[in-house]
Regions:
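Domain-edge interaction signal
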Residues: 1-167
Length: 167
């Protein structure tokens, strides 16, 4: 549902309402595509979500500003960025992506199944990260957490995110 030309309503869970601007959605999309560039063979949901979470947490500590305005919600395997998760669920056919911006975000991603049966997120063939959406500080923080997380087992990242008292 479009509230104005720049604001969309998005409900991550029944009863919750979160407003996202088109600019916020474009920034989240840029962050996801930037992370996926580091994982050309795809990345599982946990790795994607934890890079986003830890980079966001570190950015808030260091600069007092978030990288993205995605709401992290508590889930079984730790914090999950609600809008990003909704887009992935939409690709799976399990959530409605009613706005053109969310559909465009979904069109920039693919989901595949790994040999061991895990869902992998990949950038679509022609999808490109809009680097104009990312600051130098954003890129530096994302690079730091991509490097820290890339060789760590998914469930170890999940455990690490549970160490945070916020969850």
């Amino acid at each position: 549902m479009v509230v104005s030309q720049k604001t969309l309503i998005f409900a991550p869970k029944k009863g919750d309402t979160i407003m996202k601007t088109i600019d916020q959605i474009l920034k989240i999309k840029a962050v996801v595509l930037y992370i996926l560039k580091a994982f050309p063979e795809g990345v599982d949901y946990i790795h994607l979500f934890k890079v986003m979470y830890f980079a966001q947490q570190d950015q808030l500590k260091e600069y007092g500003l978030p990288i993205i305005y995605d709401t992290f919600v508590a889930r079984k395997h730790g914090p999950v960025p609600a809008l990003t998760y909704k887009v992935l669920r939409g690709i799976e056919g399990k959530a409605d992506l009613s706005s053109p911006e969310l559909k465009d975000f979904a069109d920039s991603l693919n989901i595949a199944i790994s040999q061991d049966g895990h869902q992998l997120v990949l950038a679509s063939k022609n999808a490109e990260c809009d680097m104009d959406e990312l600051s130098v500080a954003d890129v530096k923080m994302l690079d730091k957490w991509i490097e820290k997380c890339k060789d760590v087992e998914s469930f170890d990242l999940s455990d690490k995110s549970h160490e945070d008292r916020a969850w």
